[in-house]
Amino acid sequence: MLIESDLLLPIIKKGDRLGAVSERVLGQIKDGGLTGVYASTAALQEVVFWLYNRGLRQEAIQAVNAFKLLRNLEWVPLSPDICLQAAIIIKEYGVGPFDAYHAATALSRDSVVMSTEHVYGRIPGLTVLDPHVV
């Protein structure tokens, strides 16, 4: 099951509406309660871009390091095949690049995405799990 940036960024954003859900899900991953969880390295890029755009360079280093060290979370690198699939998803379903990278990564694995983003429901073959109920 892929988790994407909507479960990573709330740890960084103060007062984010998904803060408690994010903490619970990431805690379950760390403690081994949720298994088989992975994320695309594109999620780390999103975190870096979000912090960079706010002038938070040191925080970007700290955040990426913390996520990199999160136990029981596998990081899946972008490959040329995943990038090609993402480009097709962008064209066919009108989603943004990062969502397309996440979708393509999930489709290359088990086709399951845990997210609150409704965009994934437009992509055939994906199963979307709501983190509020996992």
Say what each PLM segment does.
Residues 8, 44, 120-121:
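A generic structural signal for short hydrophobic patches within well-formed alpha-helices
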Residues 1-39, 52-62, 133-134:
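Short, well-structured N-terminal submotif of metal-dependent ribonuclease cores
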Residues 70-75, 103-134:
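Acidic, PIN/NYN-like endoribonuclease modules and their adjacent C-terminal/linker elements
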Residues 14, 38-43, 71-91:
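Acidic catalytic patch
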Residues 5, 41, 80, 98-100:
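Conserved glycosyltransferase catalytic-site signature
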